[in-house]
Every structure is written in structure tokens, then in C-alpha cells.
Amino acid sequence: MTNAEVTIAVRHEPMRIAGRLVDTDDRVEVRYPWNDTVVGTVPAGRAEHAREAFAIAAAYQPKLTRYERQKILLATAEALAARKEEISDVITLELGISKADSLYEVGRAFDVFTLAGQMCIRDDGEIFSCDLTPHGKARKIFTMREPLTAISAITPFNHPLNMVAHKVAPAIATNNCVVVKPTELTPMTALLLADILYEAGLPPEMLSVVTGWPADIGMEMITNPHVDLVTFTGSVPVGKLIAANAHYKRQVLELGGNDPLIILNDLSDDDLARAADLAVAGATKNSGQRCTAVKRILCQESVADRFVPLVLERAKRLRFGDPMDRSTDLGTVIHEKAAALFEERVMRAAEEGADILYHPGRSGALLPPIVVDRVPHQSDLVLEETFGPIIPIVRVPDDDDATITLSNSTAFGLSSGVCTNDYRRMQKYIAGLKVGTVNIWEVPGYRIEMSPFGGIKDSGNGYKEGVIEAMKSFTNVKTFSLPWP
């Protein structure tokens, strides 16, 4: 047993409803995936708890100035940086990712709050002169943005801090009230973030965090009459359930992906080594539990025999094990059931003709970086969203049209990465790939926290996340005009 395991203290957290601590007799256990021990409990909240939170949000009229919003957001960012060890411990304990990955997540959340703080003092209202045509008048038309009644934010397990930050920070920046329902698997980080925001000066009525089982509280998060917008990050089935039940409410749905990294045949040996670095890092960071993780590597046939050994070499270097050990590169996935499912997909791919090149063995939720070559492109391993540190290589023809067709042949359309030095081929793939983002010489998921991000097809409903796009989605545009002699 490690020292980290010996010193774990179980956290019993209440909900935060407009700053008030609310508990229930029934509790939801939060387990450490590394050893399946209970590391915390949260209330098994019910619909009435969400209903109360939305009623408070709807009744409150935020009056924060842009300066005050910026001050709160930047103070939150600084608190995240100052408390990064404590916060990353909570993330690792409830999610199982390595300390290196959880510290990186805290850094990303710092970026979100910093950028939201910078953007909230910027006024993007527009002015239109009306004397532009023979039918014009001596007037000017102006636009301004106003907050919504209440925002419902439903967040996934794989980024317990950053996904909450991406919904809460833009809401604060636009003077909105938001109710957050984190997944029951990793709820404790969201509760800690709420406390940090209250301490930074956020009026408590502007933020509530409710917890509980989806069957008990989920539908209220979607259908409550005070909710103007539902923002959700998570699985495709749940996203479609929200779309079917939210009806006329606005929805920002960021769903799954099976993002490709595409390796083209114009690469030198040095280029292939660089591409292998991207492939392995993109497939295994955060234990592969990212919607934008590299979930299939499409390698053109004529360079595959040179590329695959480079991937194998890098995968074998990864240290996997105790997430709290500072030397660990790769921690666990969310639970043993998920690890077993992804391992089963690997074995099924092998039955379909794939070659398992590296699989040092699974232990509970600890799934190692498994390298699989010659995966059939119709295998579930690469057709479905395999949310773990699997490194599947699909050999594709030395033909760009055929490669693009294969890349587009799944139900998802989130993002992709392409490794090529040919500018004309870059343009062809940017135009031809049916995804929300194309990154050249970078992993599919690369972005900064304020750039537009989102998918098409089953990966989302076309609305974008990122601080700037979220601030637009979280507001109504009011148009008014004045005489202007």
C-alpha cells in the first residue's frame, strides 16, 4: 500500500444550493478507481433539490458590473493555481487519472477562468447606420447582450473540473445564474469549485451544484420551466435523450467522438517519429478518456511498416500504475467495467484479424496502453467511442480520397489530426473531413480554451463551446434603435 493510499480521508460533501449546504439521508458513494475504495460521498439529491435551485436562479437578477465579474473570474483562476495540488488530488481520487494529468486539468481550468475574465470586459455590441439605402432613415440600430433566466449545466466524469469550468465561467462572464449537475461518478471537484467561486466573491444565488442519480434528478435538469438553455457534455445516447425532452429550450450538446490521427505517405523517418509521439500521447493522455482522444490511427499503407514500430516503442515507455505516484504516466479508467469493455473490444478486433502488438495485462480499472495493428476499419474498436488508452492502427490505401472516405465513415464528426508536409494535401483534408476541427501536425483535440470547439453528426448539434462561443450561446441579443440626426 502506498503512502497516498494510507492518508486518504473520506470526504462527505453536501450539495451547494445558492451557497447553502444541503444534505440528504441517502448518499452516493464516490470510489477511487485504482483500488475501488470509497473516497467520498455526496447527497442523493432529488428533483425537488434541482427545482429549488432553479427557482432561486430565476428569481435572482445579477447586477455585477463587468469589472466585478472580471475580478471574480480572475480571483478564481488564481485560487486554482494556488490550490492546484489539493484540487488535483481530488480529481485523481475520483477519476483515477495520474497526478500529471490531473495537474494539467487544473492548469486548463486556470486558462478558462483567466480567458473568461479577459473576455467579459469586452463589449461585442454592434452599431448599424440606417442611411445606407434610398429607403433609409436618420437612425442608428444597436445590439446588446442580456443574460438568460437560468442555465442547466450537466457535466461528464472525464474532466471533473475543466468541463464544469467551461460552463460556469462563461455563465458568470455574461451575468447568468447556473445550476450544475456533475455526474455521480466524479462530483466532488465541482463542489470544491463552487466553494472557490463563493470565496472569490460570486453571489451564491448565481451558482448551485446539485448531486444525485440521473434517474432521480436528471429530468428536472432538462425540463424545468425556468431553464432557457441546457448545456451538456457527455455520451451520444444521453445527448439525444436531452434533445428529445428539452423541446423548445436551447441546447448546446457536446457529445462523443472517435477522432482519427491520419498519417500520410509523404513523411520522412523523422516525421514519422514526430507523428508517433502525437499518436501515443493523443491516445493515452487522461487515460484516453477524452472525447477528442486519438481513437483510431489511419496510416497510409506505404509508410505503415516504418510507423508502427515507432508507436510500439513509445507505448512501451509509458509507466502505468498508481495514479498518485508522481512517476506514473497513465492511471486508471473510470471503473473496472469500462476497462473490461474496452479490453473486450481489443480481443474482438483480434478475432477479426487485428494484431495485438502490446498488451501487458489489465488489472481491475488499470488498463495499460494496448497497441493494436491492422485493425479492420469496421471493427467496433474504432467504429465506437472506445474511451480508454487503446492505440489502434488502421492501415489505409495510399489514396487520399479513399482515406478521407474511411475517416468520414463513422457516425461521429468531432475532430481530427493530419500529419503531412504537403500544403495541397493539407487543404484537401481540411475541406474533405466531415468534422468540427481539423488540426495539421497536432492531435485532434488541440485547442485553446476560448477557440470554437464542437462537432457535427453524432458528436454534437453544431453549436460550439469555448469561452467566446459559450458567452454568445448564454445570452439573448436585444436590438434597439434611436433617432440619429
UniProtKB/Swiss-Prot annotation:
<dbReference type="GO" id="GO:0000166">
    <property type="term" value="F:nucleotide binding"/>
</dbReference>
<comment type="function">
    <text>Plays an important role in phosphonate degradation by catalyzing the NAD-dependent conversion of phosphonoacetaldehyde (PnAA) to phosphonoacetate (PnA). Has low in vitro activity with the related compounds phosphonopropionaldehyde (3-oxopropyl phosphonate) and glyceraldehyde 3-phosphate.</text>
</comment>
<dbReference type="InterPro" id="IPR016163">
    <property type="entry name" value="Ald_DH_C"/>
</dbReference>
<feature type="active site" description="Proton donor/acceptor">
    <location>
        <position position="254"/>
    </location>
</feature>
<feature type="active site" description="Nucleophile">
    <location>
        <position position="291"/>
    </location>
</feature>
<comment type="similarity">
    <text>Belongs to the aldehyde dehydrogenase family.</text>
</comment>
<feature type="binding site">
    <location>
        <begin position="290"/>
        <end position="292"/>
    </location>
    <ligand>
        <name>substrate</name>
    </ligand>
</feature>
<feature type="binding site">
    <location>
        <position position="385"/>
    </location>
    <ligand>
        <name>NAD(+)</name>
    </ligand>
</feature>
<feature type="binding site">
    <location>
        <begin position="181"/>
        <end position="184"/>
    </location>
    <ligand>
        <name>NAD(+)</name>
    </ligand>
</feature>
<keyword id="KW-0560">Oxidoreductase</keyword>
<dbReference type="Pfam" id="PF00171">
    <property type="entry name" value="Aldedh"/>
</dbReference>
<feature type="binding site">
    <location>
        <position position="235"/>
    </location>
    <ligand>
        <name>NAD(+)</name>
    </ligand>
</feature>
<comment type="subunit">
    <text>Homodimer.</text>
</comment>
<protein>
    <recommendedName>
        <fullName>Phosphonoacetaldehyde dehydrogenase</fullName>
        <ecNumber>1.2.1.-</ecNumber>
    </recommendedName>
</protein>
<feature type="binding site">
    <location>
        <begin position="155"/>
        <end position="157"/>
    </location>
    <ligand>
        <name>NAD(+)</name>
    </ligand>
</feature>
<comment type="pathway">
    <text>Phosphorus metabolism.</text>
</comment>
<keyword id="KW-0614">Plasmid</keyword>
<dbReference type="InterPro" id="IPR016161">
    <property type="entry name" value="Ald_DH/histidinol_DH"/>
</dbReference>
<feature type="binding site">
    <location>
        <position position="159"/>
    </location>
    <ligand>
        <name>substrate</name>
    </ligand>
</feature>
<keyword id="KW-0520">NAD</keyword>
<dbReference type="InterPro" id="IPR051020">
    <property type="entry name" value="ALDH-related_metabolic_enz"/>
</dbReference>
<feature type="binding site">
    <location>
        <position position="108"/>
    </location>
    <ligand>
        <name>substrate</name>
    </ligand>
</feature>
<feature type="binding site">
    <location>
        <position position="447"/>
    </location>
    <ligand>
        <name>substrate</name>
    </ligand>
</feature>
<dbReference type="InterPro" id="IPR017656">
    <property type="entry name" value="Put_phosphonoacetaldehyde_DH"/>
</dbReference>
<dbReference type="InterPro" id="IPR015590">
    <property type="entry name" value="Aldehyde_DH_dom"/>
</dbReference>
<keyword id="KW-0547">Nucleotide-binding</keyword>
<dbReference type="InterPro" id="IPR029510">
    <property type="entry name" value="Ald_DH_CS_GLU"/>
</dbReference>
<dbReference type="GO" id="GO:0008911">
    <property type="term" value="F:lactaldehyde dehydrogenase (NAD+) activity"/>
</dbReference>
<dbReference type="InterPro" id="IPR016162">
    <property type="entry name" value="Ald_DH_N"/>
</dbReference>
